[in-house]
Structures are given as C-alpha cells and as structure tokens.
C-alpha cells in the first residue's frame, strides 16, 4: 500500500508519510524537478494575473488614474509603506471617536519593504509590489506542491488556476500581505505532509508575523504535532523535531501580539484593543449579522452583497471539503481561516480577501471540473475569469476597502 493510500484511509495522520516513498515521491524534494512539474500551472496562474493587471491598467487610464498607484498604494498598502518608511507610531483619530493605530499591521511585510528599499533605489510602493508578485508566484508553486502531493498533477494545476481567478485575486497583484501569507502557509503545509517538521514550524512562525490570520498555520502545525506526539507516545526517538515545530509555529504571532501589548501597557489585551479601534473583534458573527440586516433595510455599496455571496460560497465549499475527509493539516488550517472570517466583525466587505489564503476550499470545485466535460469546464473557468477581471478592477477603484 502506498503512502498516499494510507493517508486517504487514515486522514487524521495523513500528514505523516512513509519515509520509504517511491522514487517519484522523493523527486518532489528536488526543487528543479518540482518546478518543472509545476511550470504549466504557474504559467496559467501568471497568465491569469497578468491579464487581470492589464484590465486594471486599461480601466485606470480610462478614468485618469495611475495603475501603479491603484496597485501599490491603495488602502492597507499605504499603511504598510508608511511603516516601512517611518516605523510604527502612526495613529489616526476620527471624528466619530474611532482610533486607528498602525500597530494593527503585522511587521514582516513592511520589514521586507524596508529591506528592499535600503538596497535598491525604488519607492516603498514599488518594492511592495515586487515583493507581492514574487510571493504570489511562490504561493502558487506551494499550492501546486501541496495538492499534487495529495491528489496529483491535474487537480493541482486546476487548483492553482482557480486560485488565480478568484473574485478577489486582484489582491495577489497588489501591495498586500495575502500573497506572502499564502506562500508561507502553503509551504508550511507541504512541509507537514512530507514530514519536514522544522521547516513546517519555521514557516508557520513567519506566517504568524505576516497577518493576524496567520495563526491558522500555527494551529495546523500544532494540531498535527499533537497527533504525531500521541502516536509516538511510549517511544524515545524522533520527538524532538516535532516538539520544536510546535514551539516555533506560534512564536511569530505570539511575539508580535505580546510586543504590541507591552507597548500599549497591557501585555495580554493591548493588541486586541488596537484591533477594536479598527472595529475588528471576534464576536461569533454578531457584527456580520448586523451588517447583513442593514443590507436588507438600506441601500449599500455593491461590494457588501458581493462579499456576502462570496463568503457564503466559501462556507459551502468548506462543508464539501470536510465531507471529503481531508488531511488534518489542511482541515485545521482552512477551518481556522473560515472561523476567523465568519466569526469576526468589522470590514465586512473584506471577508472574501480574508479567505484568499484558504486555497484548500477550491479542492471540491477543482475535483468537480476534472470530472466535468471539457466544454463545461472551459465555460466555468471562462466565467470565473470574466468575474475575476471585472470585479477585481471594480475593487481597485471602489469607495470601500478591499
């Protein structure tokens, strides 16, 4: 019985594969061979995102806007560039009493922007764009690697293409943190399903320094590590790396949250107070229900009902994903992302963006397309492309946050 077969029969421990894998499995660890296999998927992803950027550029020129400004300095991008240039310390006080601090933004991405601008003569916005594009490519490769490992090349290629054609996929071409988080998450999950514990923990730690919902990666690593330690109870060898991964995984997220708390004078609650200033808190979806009710009773911007539809589809896909009995690592990672998105309040229109790193949600759709007739599959992909390019362009100029 192959390692893949054992994983499917025992999904709880699907992340741990037999070290005596086949030659084809071992070749996955060879970067050149792995990149060669992923090349068609990466080419499709690049084509999708380049087309999306061309559409954004054409519309920007049509309305007298700068394409670069839309992609590099919109909404959150301005905050990241500001942190990169001046460090933390900016606070905005609004007439309604809201207090928004730049401490809500995690440090790794602006730190990388600062590193690039210190050695290359480019602006922070340009550096942020380049970093996002590189991270998006690395993320697409990581998504391919995970899905290929579990389901084969055809499904992996379709998943990468679908990820590049999501309604909010324009964010993957902007100076935002979702590409970087997804890159760390995908490769951490790949390290988990191939038994590379230290890599899994280290990458999860970096994910936790990238975005608040990066804690989902740490949750996956710790859950799998806990199961592995339970499986190895009573044995003496091979446990140190598992413990190390479990310790490394949440270190980035916890370190930043505690640092913000110390800076605000409340070690445990300071960071969450900062998030409250942005109306972001976990309230089990009560805030979202209020927004949905207001959409029924009063006019609203187009992005709000679209966010509701996309988030609803995401929840449905998660249910289908769970029914397929996925590996524990993917189940926990995706479940935590969905829980944070659905249960959090604030910035309702941004919920689809928060789900962008949850690429395993696309597995049920990709599997359905592999079983569909070619004409039907092409029609679905073309429709998704049209929606992605048009809605993505709208998002870059919309009066509401991405």
What are these regions (language model features)?
Residues 164, 185-190, 198-225, 248-251, ...:
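Membrane-interface alpha helices of multi-pass inner-membrane proteins
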Residues 123-127, 143-165, 332:
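Transmembrane-helix signature of polytopic, membrane-embedded enzymes
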Residues 48-63, 67, 72, 218-231, ...:
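Membrane-lumen/periplasm interface segments of specific transmembrane helices
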Residues 107, 111, 119-138, 302-308:
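Loop-to-helix entry region of an early transmembrane alpha helix in multi-pass inner-membrane enzymes
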